Structures are given as C-alpha cells and as structure tokens.
C-alpha cells in the first residue's frame, strides 16, 4: 500500500475519532441524573453540534407546535449544545408559571440579554431574588400611578386616557390628510409615532418632537430589537456567531447603546426640573422614591432609574404599535367585522362625544374583536424565555435547575383542544347571551402577555391603550384598500411578529364634524 494511502487512511481515522469524541462529550454533558420515578422530557434526535436549529427554521412557533403534537406539552430540544424545554398547552403552562411559579420564574443568561441596558434590565436580567421583586413592584406601582390611576387635574378618567385621546385625535387627522393628499399610507409608520408619544408622556411628562431624529431612531431601532431577542436566536446558542460579521447583531447593539444614552440624557434633564411636591410622570415618581429612601439604604439608587424606565418604555411601546397596525390590516381584510364595530359605536356612543375607557363594558363586540386579534395573530408567539431556579418536575418529567424554557403562546392560542376553528378569524367566538357579553372563561384562555411572576407589567395599560386608540379611530374613520389590493397577513418572526408592509391603506371620514 502506498504511503499516501496510509496517510489518507490515518487522517480519516483521526477525523472519525475526533468526531466520535465530540459527540460522546456532548452526549455526556447533556446527560443528567434523573430522580427515580421521573422521566427526561421526550424530543426528536438532533444533529451533532447544530442540535435542532434546522428543525426550528424561520418560524419556530410553528415548528415547535408541530413537535408538541408528537411529543406532548413538555418536550426537549437542543439549540447547539444547549438543552431547551418547550412548554405547550394552557394547563401545563399555567401549572408551570402560576402554580409552580417560583420554580420557573428565572431568566436564562443569554448573550442578547446582556446587551440590553448593559445587562441590567429588570425584564431580561437573570436575577429573580428579593431586590428584583421589590423593583418590579415599584415599577408596577409607578406605571399604575401614571397610566390607569385617576388624574385629578383632568376631565379624563386617568392619565392614560388623557394622553391617548390627544394622540388618537392627531392620528385621525393625519391619516385623513394622507388619504386625501397621497391616496394611501403605510400604517405602522403613522401609528408608532402616536404610541411613542403616549408612553413618552407617561414616562417623562412630555411628547417627543414629531419627525425628530430621536423619534426616527426609536422607530427604526425597535424592529431590530424584537428580531434579536426572540426565542431561538442563534447568537445566544452559538458563541462563534458573536465574532463573525453580523449586521443584525451590530444594529441591535447600536440601538441599545443609543437608546440608553437617549434615556440617560432625558432622565438627567428631567432631574433638573424635579419637584417632589409636583409629580407628573413615572420618572418623577421614581426620583421621589429614590430621594425618600436614600438614607435608609433604599431599593432603587438613581442609576437604576434608567433601567426601569427602559423596561417600562418597552412594555408600552412595541406591543401596542403592533396591535393597532394589525387591527387596521384585519379590518380591511374583513370589512364585515369593521361594519359591526361601526354599528356598535354608533349605537352605544353616537357621534356627539368621543369614546372613553369607561365605555369598554358597553362595547362587547369591540372587545371581542381585540381578543380575537390577540388570539388569531398571536403576534407575541413566545414569552421572553424563562429558566428554572431549582431542580423541579412537571407532568412527571424532570427539569434540572438553570434549564432554558420556551413558552409557546402561539400553540395555546391555536390549540384545537381549546378552540373551535382556531385558524378562522371570528370575534363572535368570545360573545355569549345574544352577543352582548364577553365569555370570561374563554377570554382568559388567550395568551399574549405571559403568566405568573414574569407576566408583562404593562399588560393592563397596553390593553386599555389599544382599546381606546381603536375606538376613537373607528368612531371617526373607515379603513379600506383600493379594489384588487391584497393584504398579506403573513408575519415575520420575532419577539413580536410584524405583518408584511402594506402601503395602500386608506382612511375615510365617516361623518362631518
């Protein structure tokens, strides 16, 4: 046998041995000691090195829903060499996040999370101890005080209502003007400005200058943000990708750096005018708490205020923008639904006054539409990933401490065991008593904001804001597209899934003022 052949054979043997050793090492690393009476969550075989990253594809929520039908509500995959437990099914998720909430309240230590407010984000930080819990309560109280709490200086029922009415009326005028002058518009670029001004007013007591550089940077950067913190982002599980050319990751880093600088500047400017006897917004409330507690070793030093404001801004911004944009697309796709909402608004409110938050209970079809929007689109397909805080079990399966957990909200909202015709858009499914009352039991099955100890702190203000924006828009406007225009509702995957761009939306006045 020639020397070259021996050399080739030797090389192949070395390569085969190396591959075997790598596979053996990975398998050994992944193997955990399962307590007696419990089982390891089932799942498909993955590829060496890659795991199931190819299985997830471009739409992980759909791929994992399909796997749940085969392996059940508790299954395990690998992304790279990292094991991930995927939870589906409403009962299973409630058991984990509510009844066993302390076991599943952690956050995995993912690379993308470390880039958000320098790794100090209350929402994305792995910390879930007493200090985190206290700051979360403080953030909730501040958000409640300057959103859903009553405003003694205004005729509106609360601060949120006052801000939304102003911005919604401005949006109505702007959409009418664009339709009259241009003939059509792209909704998200119009909606996002109004929503940003609402959350800006609640956080800082002021609106952002319209079309300013800061506003445009926030709008552009928000899409980069949601793309990079979605469940299954490869950069979190394959460290080498952090060092290779990655335009998406670069934009994500730049957005976070710039947004923190923007918040630091805005918070510092706010502090110059701070008057603890006249608190008008969330940041002022946080300043007051910091001032009152600094002598007693308080829970929130001033340098943490930027981090909390960042989380609150995010909680009230992207979700609301996406919900309103999707609503407009759904209404032009199902014009009969829009007509029913118009009829309800005309009957209950009329045209002599504007809708208020207090009208919600009297507008069941509007509420049913919003619930079906959340369920049908499931535009937050997964919660932000969780992790286990200790060794635990679920449905007879052993889940060790620090295991990354994906919560598949999209599966819950399209589960054929829970919903009749889950892929049909039908707001009436939520109505009872001759379509006059919301079915509370069914409405509580819709998942969009998570559950348990990590439930989105902005859920209630976000729901109120979506309702009031839509009620004011639909009282005054009729949305349509030119004949023959097709609206594509296929979403692009991310932390929040975005609809395809549609530049041909029209908004026509329903009556003369």
Curated annotation (Swiss-Prot):
<dbReference type="GO" id="GO:0042448">
    <property type="term" value="P:progesterone metabolic process"/>
</dbReference>
<feature type="glycosylation site" description="O-linked (GlcNAc) serine">
    <location>
        <position position="68"/>
    </location>
</feature>
<feature type="binding site">
    <location>
        <position position="225"/>
    </location>
    <ligand>
        <name>substrate</name>
    </ligand>
</feature>
<dbReference type="GO" id="GO:0008210">
    <property type="term" value="P:estrogen metabolic process"/>
</dbReference>
<dbReference type="InterPro" id="IPR001128">
    <property type="entry name" value="Cyt_P450"/>
</dbReference>
<dbReference type="GO" id="GO:0019369">
    <property type="term" value="P:arachidonate metabolic process"/>
</dbReference>
<keyword id="KW-0560">Oxidoreductase</keyword>
<dbReference type="GO" id="GO:0042572">
    <property type="term" value="P:retinol metabolic process"/>
</dbReference>
<comment type="pathway">
    <text>Steroid metabolism; cholesterol metabolism.</text>
</comment>
<protein>
    <recommendedName>
        <fullName>Cytochrome P450 1A2</fullName>
        <ecNumber>1.14.14.1</ecNumber>
        <ecNumber>4.2.1.152</ecNumber>
    </recommendedName>
</protein>
<keyword id="KW-0503">Monooxygenase</keyword>
<keyword id="KW-0325">Glycoprotein</keyword>
<dbReference type="GO" id="GO:0005506">
    <property type="term" value="F:iron ion binding"/>
</dbReference>
<keyword id="KW-0256">Endoplasmic reticulum</keyword>
<comment type="similarity">
    <text>Belongs to the cytochrome P450 family.</text>
</comment>
<keyword id="KW-1207">Sterol metabolism</keyword>
<dbReference type="GO" id="GO:0008203">
    <property type="term" value="P:cholesterol metabolic process"/>
</dbReference>
<dbReference type="InterPro" id="IPR036396">
    <property type="entry name" value="Cyt_P450_sf"/>
</dbReference>
<keyword id="KW-0479">Metal-binding</keyword>
<comment type="pathway">
    <text>Cofactor metabolism; retinol metabolism.</text>
</comment>
<keyword id="KW-0456">Lyase</keyword>
<keyword id="KW-0492">Microsome</keyword>
<dbReference type="InterPro" id="IPR008066">
    <property type="entry name" value="Cyt_P450_E_grp-I_CYP1"/>
</dbReference>
<keyword id="KW-0349">Heme</keyword>
<dbReference type="GO" id="GO:0005789">
    <property type="term" value="C:endoplasmic reticulum membrane"/>
</dbReference>
<keyword id="KW-0276">Fatty acid metabolism</keyword>
<dbReference type="GO" id="GO:0042446">
    <property type="term" value="P:hormone biosynthetic process"/>
</dbReference>
<dbReference type="GO" id="GO:0106256">
    <property type="term" value="F:hydroperoxy icosatetraenoate dehydratase activity"/>
</dbReference>
<keyword id="KW-0472">Membrane</keyword>
<dbReference type="InterPro" id="IPR017972">
    <property type="entry name" value="Cyt_P450_CS"/>
</dbReference>
<keyword id="KW-0753">Steroid metabolism</keyword>
<feature type="binding site" description="axial binding residue">
    <location>
        <position position="456"/>
    </location>
    <ligand>
        <name>heme</name>
    </ligand>
</feature>
<dbReference type="GO" id="GO:0101020">
    <property type="term" value="F:estrogen 16-alpha-hydroxylase activity"/>
</dbReference>
<keyword id="KW-0408">Iron</keyword>
<keyword id="KW-0443">Lipid metabolism</keyword>
<comment type="function">
    <text>A cytochrome P450 monooxygenase involved in the metabolism of various endogenous substrates, including fatty acids, steroid hormones and vitamins. Mechanistically, uses molecular oxygen inserting one oxygen atom into a substrate, and reducing the second into a water molecule, with two electrons provided by NADPH via cytochrome P450 reductase (NADPH--hemoprotein reductase). Catalyzes the hydroxylation of carbon-hydrogen bonds. Exhibits high catalytic activity for the formation of hydroxyestrogens from estrone (E1) and 17beta-estradiol (E2), namely 2-hydroxy E1 and E2.</text>
</comment>
<dbReference type="Pfam" id="PF00067">
    <property type="entry name" value="p450"/>
</dbReference>
<dbReference type="GO" id="GO:0020037">
    <property type="term" value="F:heme binding"/>
</dbReference>
<dbReference type="GO" id="GO:0101021">
    <property type="term" value="F:estrogen 2-hydroxylase activity"/>
</dbReference>
<dbReference type="InterPro" id="IPR002401">
    <property type="entry name" value="Cyt_P450_E_grp-I"/>
</dbReference>
<comment type="subunit">
    <text>Interacts with PGRMC1; the interaction requires PGRMC1 homodimerization.</text>
</comment>
<dbReference type="GO" id="GO:0004508">
    <property type="term" value="F:steroid 17-alpha-monooxygenase activity"/>
</dbReference>
């Amino acid at each position: 046998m020639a020397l070259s052949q021996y050399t080739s054979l030797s090389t192949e043997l070395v390569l085969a041995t190396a591959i075997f050793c790598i596979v053996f090492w990975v398998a050994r690393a992944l193997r955990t000691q399962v307590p007696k009476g419990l089982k390891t969550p089932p799942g498909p075989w993955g590829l060496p090195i890659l795991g199931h990253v190819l299985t997830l594809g471009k739409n992980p929520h759909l791929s994992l829903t399909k796997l749940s039908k085969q392996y059940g509500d508790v299954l395990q995959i690998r992304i790279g060499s990292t094991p991930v437990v995927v939870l589906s099914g409403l009962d299973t998720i409630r058991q984990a996040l509510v009844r066993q909430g302390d076991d599943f309240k952690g956050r995995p230590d993912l690379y993308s999370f470390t880039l958000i407010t320098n790794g100090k984000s209350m929402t994305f930080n792995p910390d879930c101890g007493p200090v985190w819990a206290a700051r979360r309560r403080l953030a909730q109280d501040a958000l409640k005080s300057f959103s859903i709490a009553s405003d003694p200086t205004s005729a509106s029922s609360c601060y949120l209502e006052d801000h939304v009415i102003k911005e919604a009326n401005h949006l109505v005028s702007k959409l009418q003007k664009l339709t009259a002058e241009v003939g059509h518009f792209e909704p998200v670029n119009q909606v996002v400005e109004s929503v940003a001004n609402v959350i800006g007013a609640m956080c800082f007591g002021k609106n952002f200058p319209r079309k300013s550089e800061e506003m445009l940077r926030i709008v552009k950067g928000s899409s980069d943000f949601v793309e990079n913190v979605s469940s299954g982002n490869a950069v979190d599980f394959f460290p080498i990708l952090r060092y290779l050319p990655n335009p998406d990751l670069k934009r994500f880093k730049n957005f976070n750096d710039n947004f923190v600088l923007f918040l630091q500047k805005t918070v510092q400017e706010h502090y110059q005018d701070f008057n603890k006897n006249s608190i008008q917004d969330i940041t002022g409330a946080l300043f007051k708490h910091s001032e009152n507690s600094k002598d007693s070793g308080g829970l929130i030093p001033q340098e943490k205020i930027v981090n909390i404001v960042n989380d609150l801004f995010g909680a009230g911004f992207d979700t609301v923008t996406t919900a309103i944009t999707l609503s407009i697309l759904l209404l032009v796709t199902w014009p009969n639904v829009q007509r029913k909402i118009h009829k309800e608004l005309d009957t209950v409110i009329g045209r002599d006054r504007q809708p208020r938050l207090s009208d919600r209970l009297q507008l069941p079809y509007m509420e049913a539409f919003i619930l079906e929007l959340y369920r049908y689109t499931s535009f937050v397909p997964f919660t932000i990933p969780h992790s286990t805080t200790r060794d635990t079990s679920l449905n007879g399966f052993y889940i060790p401490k620090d295991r990354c957990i994906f919560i598949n909200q999209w599966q819950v909202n399209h589960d054929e065991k829970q919903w009749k015709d889950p892929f049909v858009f039908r707001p009436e499914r939520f109505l009872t008593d001759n379509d006059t009352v919301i079915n509370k039991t069914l409405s509580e099955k819709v998942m969009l904001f998570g559950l348990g100890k990590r439930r989105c702190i902005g859920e209630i203000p976000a729901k109120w804001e979506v309702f009031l924006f839509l009620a004011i828009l639909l009282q005054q406007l009729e949305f349509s597209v030119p004949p023959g225009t097709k609206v594509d509702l296929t979403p692009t995957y991310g932390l929040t899934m975005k609809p395809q761009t549609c530049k041909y939306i029209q908004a026509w006045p329903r009556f003369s003022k």
